[in-house]
Regions:
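Extended catalytic cores of very large enzyme megasubunits
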Residues: 1-603
Length: 605
């Protein structure tokens, strides 16, 4: 493919064409103590403090960056694209603590990302000439620096650590399909093939310990969370509570396993220290355990309310019981602990009982006072989303959705019965009133914002690849609706950066950017590794790309259009059409150069 320059000048170092400045970034506790500090870092001149903080706190590699590097020669790759490894001889001359550090400049990050994309695109045969590769590199660095576009977070976390710095580690159980042979390969390292995809949909079978089953899913999810990705699954294959097991006995049901997955996700921060796990749980509306699932977070939220209110009441009344014992100085050491003799103690005990403080706790405080203690310590909780109260209850580490069909919605309209189906034999487990089930969903969404709804019939009517299988689930944010065991790589174009001062939208520059980023996302599929064989194969076969735009609200506001207006919808539709058309045209270009993706015959648009 050939590439033209629109933003940059040939023959000049791209970083010399851009302005950078020194900045700092900090995170402080409410008491002023410093949690994170990055001083004297380098960012593009126009970066806001928010952009600086995100780059420094989330996307800079924090460790393992060598102070000295050397290139690894590859005969079929231009020398400026050779990957780097630590220069051990040069490092040996430095003090041990100076040999490795973290990234401190946006230049390092942009080179790490774009250099890796260019390297793999070159190896994949995407460039007609070396000059095309240089043009692609410069234009992409420019767009990142000017905040014209950005890839999804796993790219910032993982892409280029091996290419730019020689950072690596043992295989984590990932797989990829070799782009040259089409054969499945088990990854031999952590970062040579990075995990750049943000959005995954994974299948799960009604099997406890075998590959593809319940416990295997938690392992696959852990691989994704570790490198900063998110995942969604439809758990409707799992049998309901009380259904028969093959070895005799009854199943503990769907909810028992969802709670295990919830705890596992909560224990792993996506990207190590970067963010929390992103997880979507979906269950079909005809599952036998659907009612308990709908109410799951409602009940857990009520537990938090009970913890908060109960802990504060207990602390208040137990302290009053203690104070009544301690301050009864006019009574002897026997009478002061006897409510028949100590009127203040009697009053405090009655108030505690009225507040439903457990009797054994009241007596424990009195016994504590008898041992000479003068105050009681009882932990209280609050409703902060990151508090210990929320860490204590279940259901806090996923978005929950219910998959509803048109048949169910019609049953709601007719106030008819709805059948819940056993997973083991397909027979009816129970009949419930569809309207009441709908009201239960509405109440739960009002009470705790979950579950959301996924309209199964409509989603599959819009399916672009129905021959490949049905759509059962989505990623956590739900912008990716596709087949089980596939992944999608996202990037967003910042629309405000394509708006001129006079209000004109630069369509030509926008199309230019769409073409470059379509190639980037396609390259990311080529270079990626995946958490299972099935996802590696599915992503290779379909090569789904997630190109979109951001800041439509800002563009509409700058144009003077209200968000929900005919003008706004027309503008949004036009931009979407241009983006989609140019991306499709670029995909056709790529197919002409390197061949179409394997499952093209199953696609209809």
């Amino acid at each position: 493919m050939q590439f033209e320059r629109r933003f940059t000048t040939p023959g000049t170092d791209i970083f010399a064409q851009l302005s950078y400045r020194k900045a700092s970034s900090e995170i402080r506790n409410p008491d002023g103590t410093i949690v994170f500090s990055a001083q004297d870092i380098e960012v593009p001149e126009q970066f806001s403090q928010v952009a600086t903080d995100i780059l420094a706190q989330k996307y800079f590699r924090k460790a393992g960056v060598p102070a000295a590097l050397k290139k690894v020669e590859e005969n079929d790759v231009p020398s400026w694209l050779w990957r780097s490894v630590p220069d051990e001889k040069a490092l040996a001359k430095l003090e041990e603590e100076a040999r490795y550090s973290g990234e401190t400049s946006a230049r390092q990050v942009f080179n790490r990302l774009v250099g890796t994309w260019t390297y793999w695109a070159w190896k994949g045969g995407y460039f007609t000439t070396e000059e095309d590769a240089k043009t692609y590199y410069d234009e992409m660095v420019f767009m990142l620096s000017m905040q014209m576009a950005a890839p999804n977070s796993p790219q910032w976390f993982n892409t280029g650590l091996h290419w730019a710095y020689g950072i690596d580690g043992p295989s984590q159980g990932h797989f990829y399909v070799d782009y040259q042979t089409g054969k499945m390969v088990r990854s031999k390292s952590s970062y040579e093939h990075p995990q750049p995809h943000a959005c995954f949909i994974q299948s799960v079978d009604d099997d406890l310990v075998n590959e593809g089953g319940i416990m295997d899913l938690w392992v696959r999810e852990a691989r994704l969370f570790k490198y900063g990705s998110g995942t969604g699954s439809n758990f409707s294959r799992l049998r309901g509570s009380g259904e028969s097991l093959s070895g005799g006995g009854k199943s503990s049901g769907l909810m028992s396993f969802l709670k295990i997955g919830d705890r596992a996700a909560g224990a792993i921060k996506s990207g190590g220290t970067t963010r929390r796990a992103a997880k979507m749980v979906t269950v079909d509306i005809d599952h036998p355990d659907i009612e308990e699932y709908i109410d799951w977070k409602v009940v857990e939220e009520q537990k938090v309310a009970a913890l908060v209110a109960g802990s504060k009441l207990a602390q208040k009344h137990m302290s009053e019981v203690m104070r009544a014992c301690v301050e009864a100085s006019d009574l002897d050491d026997v009478a002061r602990y006897n409510p028949k003799e100590n009127k203040e103690l009697k009053k405090a005990i009655l108030a505690a009982r009225k507040a439903m403080i457990p009797e054994n706790y009241v007596q424990r405080v009195i016994q504590f006072a008898q041992q000479g203690f003068t105050e009681i310590s009882f932990k209280t909780y609050d409703t902060d989303w990151d508090s210990e109260a929320y860490l204590t209850v279940a259901g806090q580490n996923s978005n929950n959705s219910v998959r509803v069909t048109n048949d169910f919605l019609n049953a709601v309209l007719e106030n008819g019965d709805w059948e819940l189906i056993r997973r083991t034999d397909g027979k009816v487990a129970e009949k419930v009133n569809a309207g009441e089930l709908w009201q239960k969903i509405a109440h739960a969404a009002w009470a705790c914002a979950d579950p959301g709804l996924q309209y199964d019939t409509t989603i599959n009517e819009w399916h672009t690849c129905p021959i490949g299988g049905r759509i059962n689930a989505s990623n956590p944010c739900s912008e990716y609706m596709f087949l089980d065991d596939t992944a999608c790589n996202l990037a967003s174009l910042n629309l405000m950066q394509f708006r001129h001062a006079d209000g004109r939208f630069d369509i030509e520059a926008f199309e230019h950017a769409v073409r470059l980023w379509t190639v980037t996302l396609e390259t990311s599929v080529l270079m990626a590794q995946f958490p299972s064989r099935e996802i590696a194969q599915g992503s290779y076969d379909y090569r789904t790309l997630g190109l979109g735009f951001a800041n439509i609200g800002g563009l509409l506001m700058a144009a003077g259009y209200s968000y929900d207006s005919d003008e706004a919808r027309a503008l949004c539709g036009a931009i979407s059409a241009v983006m989609t058309g140019r991306s499709y045209a670029t995909s056709a270009e790529l197919a002409g150069e390197v061949g179409a993706f394997p499952r093209l015959s199953l696609i209809h648009i």
